[in-house]
């Protein structure tokens, strides 16, 4: 894999202008009042980044079409060029478990509603840990099992994740897909996915491989050598989500 350099990235110069242009792109003329909507501006979430990672360069994994990251010092990455027909904000593209930057490159990593889509979170988080500086922070915003369409599914345990590392991937994915279809799609809890063929959901980033509450993710991160800085059951400006902030030790 060819390594990239942070110094080669074209960072945004003006964060407020970047934010305005993105809201304009997504909402059109409604921008003039949408700018101040709490669920769009996400002031509380932005403050957590300022409080826990107020300096240094960061990497956002799977940024999609919205971000809360400080654009003047964050590299926006994604695995996909577009999401549901909308162009990603990302300027660099790669798989979340294969990051083309050197060891200890970043002061923080931000991930919002990404890790639940990843089949092998242990491998992925270890890769994120590799590119984090010592004492670097990881910010995980994730869907809460009890407040999303995953509420009828069993939670993903650490042992489940260990099994995925060594088990037969094709068979395990088939079992997860069956659970997803039976407890989410067939119950009409995610109708925006109805047009996607079942087998496609495995490869296109649709399916939630993981179902968690904060305690599950805290255990996972501690098991991988992180210290927990902060966690919250319900994010004030994204109420379907919980937050865990951890530090590389």
Ranges and model annotations:
Residues 1-52:
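Membrane-proximal basic amphipathic "stem/tether" segments
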Residues 52-53, 103, 125:
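A short, aliphatic-rich alpha-helical micro-motif
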Residues 52-98:
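Class I SAM-dependent methyltransferase SAM/SAH-binding core
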Residues 56, 105, 135-136:
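Surface-exposed loop/turn positions
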Residues 94-109:
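A short acidic, Gly/Pro-enriched loop at the edge of an enzyme's catalytic core
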Residues 107-119:
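A short SAM/SAH-binding and catalytic strip from SAM-dependent methyltransferases
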Residues 118-119, 132-134:
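Helix-to-beta-strand junctions that scaffold the AdoMet/dcAdoMet cofactor pocket
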Residues 122-123, 127, 137-249:
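S-adenosyl-L-methionine-dependent methyltransferase catalytic module, highlighting the catalytic core
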